[in-house]
């Protein structure tokens, strides 16, 4: 897959990775870091707050990279404090709201997201501004 990632990078396209889930080694944050080490300024999205059920590994492995995270399939599994820890680690400017629809109800995911207690400006960034910037929709 490395040639695909290199071409996406050459074209300025971010790639979304399913990250986490300790039931398999295929999607660990470490695996994503292996790609980033080969393409150092690679822009990608690590789904599920960087690594479903492997959030500490995600924060350790993916620090200092151009990784964005999303909130999909995670907010039901962590406390608001744990979610905030990951969001603040990667930065509000590198976090995007996600639902993993149709697996989860968008309405319930939004309720969980708003329960995190961020202010209007941060919510606006995570709900759409970061996505628009990353995918150059605002240009």
Regions found by a protein language model. Give the residues of each.
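Short glycine/proline-rich, acidic loop/turn segments that cap or connect secondary-structure elements
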Residues: 99-106
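Conserved, mostly hydrophobic/aromatic
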Residues: 8, 48, 69, 100, ...
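Catalytic pocket-lining loop regions of alpha/beta-barrel enzymes
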Residues: 1-96
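Short, solvent-exposed coil/turn elements at secondary-structure transition points
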Residues: 50-52, 75, 101, 119, ...
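Mid-to-C-terminal alpha-helical segments outside catalytic/metal-binding sites
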Residues: 91-94, 107-139
């Amino acid at each position: 897959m490395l040639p695909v990632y290199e071409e996406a990078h050459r074209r300025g396209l971010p790639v979304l990775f399913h990250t986490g889930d300790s039931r398999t080694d295929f999607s660990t944050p470490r695996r994503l870091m292996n790609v980033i080490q080969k393409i150092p300024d690679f822009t990608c999205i690590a789904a599920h707050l960087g690594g479903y059920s492997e959030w500490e590994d995600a924060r350790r492995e993916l620090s200092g990279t151009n990784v964005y995270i999303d909130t999909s399939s995670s907010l039901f599994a962590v406390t608001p404090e744990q979610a905030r820890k990951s969001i603040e680690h990667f930065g509000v400017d590198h976090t995007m709201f996600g639902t993993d629809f149709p697996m989860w109800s968008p309405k319930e995911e939004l309720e969980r997201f708003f329960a995190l207690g961020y202010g209007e400006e941060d919510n606006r960034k995570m709900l759409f501004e970061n996505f628009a910037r990353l995918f150059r929709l605002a240009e």
